[in-house]
Each structure stands twice: as structure tokens, then as C-alpha cells.
Amino acid sequence: RVTVRELVKAGKNLQIGTLSDLQGHCEIGDYVRFHSNVHIGQKSKIGNFVWIFPYVVLTNDPHPPSENLLGVTVEDYAAIATMSVILPGATIAEGCLIGAHSTVKGLTEPHCIYVGSPAKNVGSTSKIKLPDGTSAYPWTQHFKRGYPEDITQNW
């Protein structure tokens, strides 16, 4: 079961995992991947080629319960690891990696790694290496599965 509420605007090739919940009034870009048990709060704005892994929650109410909802923004090519919580009004910058079990508030810097609760910037994503020694990020340099060739040839 997946719940997609009213006024969700989604781009091309959105993939939604089992038991995910997309609240209304959200904007979602092209080629976004939501794994299982993801919660996207109202007023969230998610860019293109974003990965959100299991049990991630994008919150939206800074003083619950209230009518003053602040959506989360996730920019292009960001990845949010399992069980992370993104607090109301936060912005995950382009190419950011949010580590598992992290709690993010405020603004992040592009292409940086954030871990912990509260999440802290621990450096550039370029310092993460694959087993062969090449950079794991940006992930578009080595991962193309499930994307059309006309898209990946421009990476």
C-alpha cells in the first residue's frame, strides 16, 4: 500500500516503495526514488534524481499541532539515508548525502556529508571512495541502473 494525497505534483519516472506516504501539496521532480516506509510531509519540494531510503521522514510542523506548516526542500541529486528525520523548513542542498539516523534542520551546503543528531557537516562527498579507489560521489559517475540511456549519457 502507498498513499499519495491530493495536490502532489510529480515528474517523470517517480518510484515509490511499499508503505510510503506522500502528503498533499508536494512537488516532486523527475526520476525520484522513494524506498519503502518513506513519509513526505505537506509542502515538501523535492528536486530531480533524489534518493530517499527506508524510514526517512520529512516533517513540516515546527510547533505541532499548528497551521503554520514549513515544507522541506531537497535539491537535485541528494541522497537521504535510512531512518533520518528532516525538520520543518530544512533544505538539503544539491548532491548532499545525509547519513543514516541523522536529524537535519536549517540549510546544508552542496555536495557535503551530514551525519548525527543534530546533523553536522563532516566534509565533502568527494572524500567517500568505492572499493576500487574512485569517488563514490557524485553517484551519477558510476550508477546508471534504471535510468534511460539518453539521460545518463549527459552525466
Feature roles, as predicted:
Residues 1, 5-6, 11-12, 16-18, ...:
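Left-handed beta-helix
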Residues 54-61, 129-132, 136:
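Short glycine/proline- and charge-enriched loop/turn segments
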Residues 132-155:
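Acidic/histidine-enriched, glycine/proline-rich intrinsically disordered or flexible terminal extensions
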Residues 62-64, 90, 124-126:
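Conserved catalytic-core motifs of eukaryotic protein kinase domains, centered on the activation segment
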